[in-house]
Every structure is written in C-alpha cells, then in structure tokens.
C-alpha cells in the first residue's frame, strides 16, 4: 500500500516503524518543523523525524498545510492509497481528507468516543479509569469524531502514570494500525459511526490543571497526580512557595483539607470526603526532590502550616 505518514511525537514512532516493517511503501513522512530546545535553544528534530531518517524515508516539514499549494501538489503527485495520522499536531484540511481513496487513518489513544482531544492518556488516568485503549478511525472534519475501524483495550495499572502508560499504548496502537491497513487492503473491515451522545473530552493540558484542590478525595488527587506526570505535575503551596508532590498514597486519617500532620517519620495531608494522603516524595520550589522525612527534618512543619493555594 502506498502511504503518507503524518506524525510528530514519540507516541507516533512505533506506528511508523511497524507499517514500514509490514512492507508498506511510505513515500513521505510529514512532521512539524524543528523547534528550539534545551538551554542552548538549538533546533531539535521531532522524534518522528529522527525515526524517518533512520529508516531512510523522505521527510517534509511544512509550516502550514491548509492553504499550502506546494504541499498539496506534493501529496497529489504521490497519490497515496491512505494517509496515516498519528499525533501530527495540526488540523487536517478537507482537501487532504478527500485525497486518498482509503481516507486518512488516525491512531487515537483512547476507546472512542471517550476522551476525544489532545490528552487522552493523561485524562483517562486522571479520571480514575481502570481500562483504556486505542482506536483506529477515519478522520473527518470534527475533533476525533470520525467513524471507527478497530479498537483494542489495555488495563491501567494502579501505579501507572501517563509517562509509563504512553509507550505501551503506542505499541498497541502500532499493532492495531498494521491490522487495520491489512483489513482495509483486503476489503474486510467496516467503519462504525461513533455514539456521539457518549463522548467525553480530553483537552490539552494547561499548567493550572496541576494545581491540587485538597477538597477532592485522596484517590482523586492521586489519580490526577498520576495522569499529570510528568507535566504539569501536582503542585500546591507551602509557606508561600511552590510545593510539588511526586509520590503519595491514600491513608486512613481525619484532617481538614490541606492540613498537615506529622506521625513519626510520616507526613500526612488532609483531603476531601474525610480522606488523607501520606506524602512520600516532594519537592520545594527551587530545591531537589526529597523524601518526606527529609522535608520534616529540614522544615519542621507545625499545626499552623497548611498546603493550599495562596490567598489573594
């Protein structure tokens, strides 16, 4: 099958590698332009560009695609059977949707119609889901609203973070993509419309999503901590400074939301619905990560201290 592959992040790399390994003819890889990165702000390739070059595939990096006649002519000349889109990061214009006979095939990291949007892995964990998965779908003009082709489930382990779950879903999605293309090529797959009434959203994460609300239950806070690791993390304030929680667990204790209590070497903080957290690893603004016992010894929090948003 003649393909064009559009993708940018690390999540998309296994999909590119798998379709090449399956023998598909990837004529072009489309990825976002090189971006400044690191202290020196030197230009860095996207993970997909690195992978494409390692596979000796041609790469293009248009700044825009919607009204880009040169790019349109380039794709038209290739005449792909399908265009594969995995985390490309740009809205696919209608001309591109209409170009290939088999359509634009997307790998989305959720069990659609749940968690449509840019951060499905993070929000599935943050909302306490025990199972998630991947969906292959045909792209239409909406946001992850196209007809579904195949789905595969994956359990979310209690200790999973978005950082640990993403590589497993990327591999599962790559395998599902190869199966989807084989079935499309053989004409033995039927696209199924989504039940739009059951959709939920997974919007792009903002820094403020990491702000801890201690009126949530301990389990809700833990779910969000796991989902928002590594970014934006889970943070609050202590004595007017930023205070990041990296590891914690729910415990049986009755404290007011945000109230701190020391029990031996254990540091507890109250949460909502008569629940509490034991903080295991924390980080103060401008400092290194530390075990809670080191924080207790160094800062000696007392009954007057609380964790929470600064008052205005």
Curated annotation (Swiss-Prot):
Record bears the keyword rRNA-binding: no
EC number: 2.1.2.9
Coiled coil regions in record: none
Keywords: Protein biosynthesis, Transferase
Span of the signal peptide: none
CDD domains, alphabetized: FMT_core_Met-tRNA-FMT_N, Met_tRNA_FMT_C
Superkingdom, natural source: Bacteria
Keyword set includes Protein biosynthesis: yes
GO molecular function annotations of the record: methionyl-tRNA formyltransferase activity
Record-listed (6S)-5,6,7,8-tetrahydrofolate binding positions: 110-113
Enzyme class: transferase
PANTHER family documented for this protein: METHIONYL-TRNA FORMYLTRANSFERASE, METHIONYL-TRNA FORMYLTRANSFERASE, MITOCHONDRIAL
Similarity comment: Belongs to the Fmt family.
Described purpose of this protein according to its UniProt entry: Attaches a formyl group to the free amino group of methionyl-tRNA(fMet). The formyl group appears to play a dual role in the initiator identity of N-formylmethionyl-tRNA by promoting its recognition by IF2 and preventing the misappropriation of this tRNA by the elongation apparatus.
Protein's name in the database: Methionyl-tRNA formyltransferase
Record gene name: fmt
């Amino acid at each position: 099958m003649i393909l064009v592959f559009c993708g940018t992040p690390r999540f998309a790399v296994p999909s590119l590698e798998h379709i090449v390994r399956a023998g598909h003819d990837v004529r072009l890889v489309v990825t976002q332009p090189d971006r400044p990165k690191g202290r020196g702000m030197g230009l860095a390739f996207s993970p997909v560009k690195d992978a494409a070059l390692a596979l000796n595939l041609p790469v293009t990096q248009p700044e825009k695609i919607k009204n880009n006649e040169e790019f349109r002519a380039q794709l038209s000349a290739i005449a792909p059977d399908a265009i594969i889109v995995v985390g490309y990061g740009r809205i696919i214009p209608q001309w591109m949707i209409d170009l290939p006979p088999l359509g634009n095939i997307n790998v989305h990291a959720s069990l659609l119609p749940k968690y449509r949007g840019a951060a499905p892995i993070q929000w599935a964990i943050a909302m306490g889901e025990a199972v998630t998965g991947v969906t292959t779908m045909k792209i239409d003009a909406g946001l992850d609203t196209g007809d579904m082709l195949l789905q595969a489930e994956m359990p979310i382990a209690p200790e999973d973070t978005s950082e640990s779950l993403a590589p497993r879903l990327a591999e599962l999605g790559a395998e599902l993509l190869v199966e989807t293309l084989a079935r499309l090529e053989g004409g033995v797959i039927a696209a199924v419309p989504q039940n739009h009434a059951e959709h939920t959203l997974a919007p792009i994460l903002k820094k403020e999503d990491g702000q801890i609300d201690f009126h949530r239950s301990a389990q809700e806070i833990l779910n969000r901590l796991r989902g928002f690791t590594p970014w934006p993390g889970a943070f609050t304030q202590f004595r007017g400074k930023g205070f990041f929680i990296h590891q914690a667990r729910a415990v049986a204790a009755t404290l007011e939301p945000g109230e701190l209590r020391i029990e031996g070497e254990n540091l507890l903080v109250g949460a909502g619905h008569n629940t509490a957290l034991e903080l295991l690893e924390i980080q103060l603004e401008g400092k290194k990560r530390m075990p809670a016992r080191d924080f207790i010894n160094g800062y000696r929090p007392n009954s007057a201290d609380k964790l929470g948003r600064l008052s205005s």
